[in-house]
Amino acid sequence: MEQRKGLAGLFLVISLLQGTVAQTNKAKNLVQVDGSRGDGSVLLTCGLTDKTIKWLKDGSIISPLNATKNTWNLGNNAKDPRGTYQCQGAKETSNPLQVYYRMCENCIELNIGTISGFIFAEVISIFFLALGVYLIAGQDGVRQSRASDKQTLLQNEQLYQPLKDREYDQYSHLQGNQLRKK
């Protein structure tokens, strides 16, 4: 049993190493992404040295035929420039690069100011909540007079009524539709 586990582990290690070696032997990535521009635009840069470079998006040409620029502006990142991009020269084609922007319309940037604002607002709200509980719990309730404790509200005879015997009314029997036996 132990030999099988060892053999399976050895097979897994060898297959992972082969995948790593195969990945390093591939052509280097020639397309670079610059998404940290001040205006919010996304810029692709091709590492080919050819004079004419064609840009491909999802396999179709998106650049003019005689384009000589090695950069391609995808536009604003708010327009969601998704797709698989490649640059193609006369002799060589780059590896495909998949661009995907996760658009978050309701996100906030977490920095020290935002976090401290959240903490400050939380402390203030807890303070006001505790103050409200203290003021409400600290109030004296309306005290009833002791005279009502000494009065008998109902006479003893009025508390209970005996069941009517030998009548077949709705409440003269205990279960379901069974009538009381005589």
Swiss-Prot record:
Key word Cell inner membrane present: no
Extracellular side: 23-116
Gene Ontology BP terms: adaptive immune response; cell surface receptor signaling pathway; establishment or maintenance of cell polarity; protein transport; regulation of lymphocyte apoptotic process
Domain spans labelled Ig-like: 37-94
Main location: membrane
Cellular component annotations (GO), alphabetically ordered: alpha-beta T cell receptor complex; cytosol
Compartments in which it is found: Membrane
Name by which UniProt lists this protein: T-cell surface glycoprotein CD3 gamma chain
Organism: Mus musculus
